[in-house]
From Swiss-Prot:
Residues 1-21 form the signal peptide. Disulfide bonds join 35-81, 45-64, 50-75, 54-77. It comes from Arabidopsis thaliana. This is Putative defensin-like protein 135. One of its GO terms (biological process) is killing of cells of another organism. InterPro entries: DEFL. GO terms for cellular component: extracellular region. Belongs to the DEFL family. Keywords: Antimicrobial, Disulfide bond, Fungicide, Plant defense, Secreted, Signal. It is found in: Secreted. The lineage of its organism: Eukaryota, Viridiplantae, Streptophyta, Embryophyta, Tracheophyta.
Length: 81
């Protein structure tokens, strides 16, 4: 394996552990938010019930600032609906 590939596996493993360990009722569900570098974010909710709540932040309002957890302050953040 290349040296750049291995750390990404570690990060993915850590992320999966964090998401699965923090599953709660819907109003506290974790939202995964990827920023594209221009303060626009792509959000992924883990339940259908949370999708509507998350769409409210999708239109450029969301900026990754590490409110709940961040691997990088500008790239990958976890938010709550």
């Amino acid at each position: 394996m290349s040296k750049t590939f291995q750390p990404s596996i570690v990060m993915l493993t850590i992320f999966l552990i964090l998401v699965t360990s923090q599953r709660r009722k819907c109003d506290e569900k974790i939202v995964l938010q990827f920023c594209n570098g221009r303060n626009r974010c792509y959000e992924y909710c883990d339940t259908k019930e949370c999708v509507a709540a998350c769409k409210k932040k999708r239109n450029g309002e969301g900026i990754c600032n590490g409110d709940v957890f961040s691997v990088s302050a500008q790239c990958l953040c976890l938010y709550k609906c």
